[in-house]
Regions:
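Hydrophobic h-region of N-terminal signal peptides that target proteins for export
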Residues: 10-17
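Short, surface-exposed beta-strand/loop micro-motifs that present aromatic residues
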Residues: 123, 197-198, 404-409, 413-417, ...
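Polar, surface-exposed loop/tail segments
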Residues: 48, 77, 138, 287-290, ...
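Loop/turn elements at helix/coil->beta-strand transitions in domains of secreted/extracellular proteins
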Residues: 20-25, 56-61, 129-134, 154, ...
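His/Cys-centered metal/cofactor-coordination and adjacent catalytic loops
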Residues: 84-122, 174-175
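Active-site-proximal cap/lid insertion segments
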Residues: 29-45, 61, 65, 82, ...
Length: 518
């Protein structure tokens, strides 16, 4: 064979290999809870496109975020490392040490404010493997100099310091990496359209399209039309007569019912956005060779902030140490590998995406980088992986009532250790998924064994811990809790009942209310 023929053959093989490389679309939603989706039991929110995605691939029913708040989870997806190992253990901007002045027993630990440049992100690994890498939406894991384009993404549409949309969800907005659209344009749909445009222009090269929605993080905003739609739906479902929407749990009220029509409108827009991207994949024929991943960075907001949703039967939500704060929608669809409509009980966590993506891309794993993640490819193909425990460390107080704690989950058992006073909670999640019955006193040997494993992990990851606040006053703390239990509960009940009043309108100059974008 001539040198020319050999060269042509090599080129053809290279082109064919590139054509066979899988593409990746990664949907990361902000503050989306496990129970916020139709396929997980929500009857009030409407999410047909996300439900269809779940039905097309594998659902991980024990899928978890790496933390109960956003920045640590996001950094763990990017690095394959647990939060105490990469150092971002709280949302970037949260106060620490003596700057924390909320009459709590301990001072939150210090944490890292920028994604470490010495870490090789999953985007950098794919870029170095020949992929075009695209980012759209919320970043919130670094200040300028540590934005998506500084960590492996070749295109950045909207990722910067901030964790919520400056100016709100409807244009005009303020974002140095995303030009504001015409007045009334919805940011959620804009990000989806930017992603779809990227896919359209990238049909000849393998790509990673990472769509990180700002939604459904506050501010809670939707159109008048969508809000009215869900007011009518609430009436038909008999939800408007609720006198009690909240129950007090330790530090804050917790929403007990899904009936917020504004949040429901946001959920519908999120689903529409997912549908835009999925439709583009089908239109271009890339759906046959594109891995689609869908997850959230932490639980839904059941307490604090906008008190948006309910995640029952799980306890708590965003910021809190119970299942509502960390168990997430976790979907992986791999054409030709995953069987439609399948689910897995395997324990999975955010760090697992990194090695899973590399293996599916046919690229070498980087075990020294994604040290806390394992590839889920065997599970996706119907096989098993060795059993393991999952761990969390959050040495901070959450705005949503979370307490400084560390967690281990091993099989059906979950142990929570509280750094304020050393108390523990032990739950059997098979028998008690709502974490109602603390059985620590009944199983002292199990507590001891799990606590030893947790302590070993904390030492191995270099975890930082909170310190006692010398200013602490039990009297002031008790008064704070009592005020929240009474005045806050009453105000919330009144406000959230008003949301369902057909005559309700937002106060002030709320330009989002008049938008026609849906």
């Amino acid at each position: 064979m001539s040198k020319y023929a050999i060269s042509v053959l090599i080129c053809l093989l290279a082109v064919n290999a590139k054509a066979e490389q899988r593409n990746f679309v990664f949907f990361l939603v902000d503050d989306l809870g496990f129970g916020d989706l139709g396929y997980n039991g929500s009857e009030f929110y409407e999410t047909p496109h996300i439900d269809a995605l779940a039905a097309s691939g594998m659902r991980f029913d024990n899928g978890y975020a790496a933390c109960q708040v956003c920045s640590p989870s996001r950094a763990s997806i990017m690095t394959g490392k647990a939060p105490p190992r990469h150092g971002i253990t709280d949302w970037i901007g949260a106060k620490t040490g003596m700057d924390w002045q909320r009459d709590d027993l301990v001072l939150p630990a210090e944490y890292v404010w920028n994604l470490p440049h010495e870490d090789i992100t999953v985007a950098e690994a794919l870029r170095d493997g020949g992929y075009t890498t695209f980012y759209a939406g919320k970043w919130h894991i670094g200040t300028k100099g540590s934005w998506p384009e500084d960590h492996g993404f070749m295109i950045n549409k909207g990722g910067w310091d901030k964790g919520s949309p400056m100016g709100g969800y409807f244009a005009p907005w303020d974002n140095p990496r995303l030009e504001s659209g015409p007045d009334g344009e919805l940011l959620t749909l804009r990000l989806a359209n930017e992603t779809a445009s990227f896919i359209e222009s990238s049909q000849d090269e393998p790509f990673l399209a990472y769509l990180s929605f700002y939604t459904v993080h506050g501010p809670i905003q939707t159109t008048e039309a969508l809000r009215n739609k869900y007011v009518e739906k609430a009436e038909k479902m008999g939800l408007t007569g609720n006198d009690t929407r909240f129950k007090f749990d330790r530090r804050l009220p917790v929403r007990q019912v899904q009936d917020n029509p504004i949040y429901a409108g946001m959920m519908e827009s999120l689903d529409t956005a997912v549908g835009i991207v999925m439709a583009k994949l089908k239109e271009t024929g890339l759906d046959k060779n594109t891995v689609v991943i869908f997850t959230s960075d932490n639980g839904g907001v059941t307490t604090g902030d906008a008190y948006s949703t309910s995640l029952l039967p799980f306890r708590g939500g965003k910021g809190r140490q119970w299942e509502g704060g960390i168990r997430e929608p976790y979907i992986i669809h791999v054409p030709g590998l995953t069987k439609p409509g399948t689910s897995s009980d395997v324990l999975a966590i955010g760090m697992d995406f990194y090695p899973t993506i590399l293996e599916l891309a046919g690229l070498p794993l980087r075990p020294e980088q994604h040290v806390d993640g394992v590839s889920l490819v065997p599970v996706l193909s119907g096989k098993n992986i060795p059993e393991r425990a999952l761990y969390w460390h959050y040495p901070h107080y959450g705005n949503q009532g979370g307490e400084p704690s560390s967690i281990i989950r091993s099989k059906e058992w979950k142990l929570i250790y509280y750094h304020e006073d050393g108390r523990v909670e032990l739950y059997n999640l098979i028998n008690d998924m709502g974490e109602v019955n603390n059985v620590a006193a009944a199983y002292p040997e199990k507590v001891s064994e799990m606590q030893k494993r947790l302590n070993h992990w904390l030492a191995d990851t270099g975890a930082r811990f909170p310190a006692r606040d010398p200013r602490y006053s039990q009297e002031r703390f008790d008064q704070k809790i009592e005020n929240t239990r009474t005045a806050k509960m009453e105000a919330l009940e009144k406000q959230h009942a008003e949301f369902l009043d057909p005559e309700w309108e937002p106060a002030g100059n709320a330009r989002w209310w008049g938008s026609a974008e849906d």
